[in-house]
Amino acid sequence: MRLILPADTEGIFLERKSRFTGVALVEGKKTLIHIHNTGRLPLLKKGKRVLLKRAESDRRKTGWDLLAVEHRDEFVFVHSGFHSIVAGKILEELFPGSTIESEKRFENSRFDFLIDRRTFVEVKGCTYEEDGVAMFPDAPTERGRRHIEELISSVKSGFKALLLILVFLESDCFLPNRNVDPAFSRVFWRALKSGVNIDVFRVKYDGEYLCSTEKLSICEEV
């Protein structure tokens, strides 16, 4: 999978003002930027280099969208608004020739995709790691837990289900973050035992392209 998404400029992150806004030094000026990610984003710290895309609308209070933040030797893509686009490209490669529909409802949830009217797909983006282990979530997520419970329910109803996890930073394997959200971790392992397929893909960003480079394994829980 390769998706072109060039950043328009680079800045220096200064502070997070609210859930969706932050301040960065852009072209020598303190500038309000939009953060399209509801997670805590622990890697978003003062002084980090960030990649930004100019907002398409001049009516917004924030003139720039945060795309990626510097972390060690790479830029980590953090704009969750592109998760479905990236996932859709990956699914086209995983299921060639299949009919892929987006935003399909099942019971009380709306899943990201439905493949050939029989496989529900939910997508999660991961931007946090510890000691080479990618972890999701980085903040408690009632919505995320509910989505996985509904995937389990869909399997019981005769459908197939896939949890597709996109890991945007260098990692060796993936684990649910039980320290941050024990309930999510429990339902994650229950989903595996209940027949929900879980695929984890590493996605890199170089300021020009988003590329899925490899499939990661699920770590053994300690």
From Swiss-Prot:
Domain of life: Bacteria
Gene3D superfamilies: 2.40.50.580, 3.40.1350.60
GO molecular function, one term: DNA binding
UniProt xrefs under Pfam families: SfsA (PF03749), SfsA_N (PF17746)
The family this protein is said to belong to: Belongs to the SfsA family.
This protein's name: Sugar fermentation stimulation protein homolog
Gene designation: sfsA
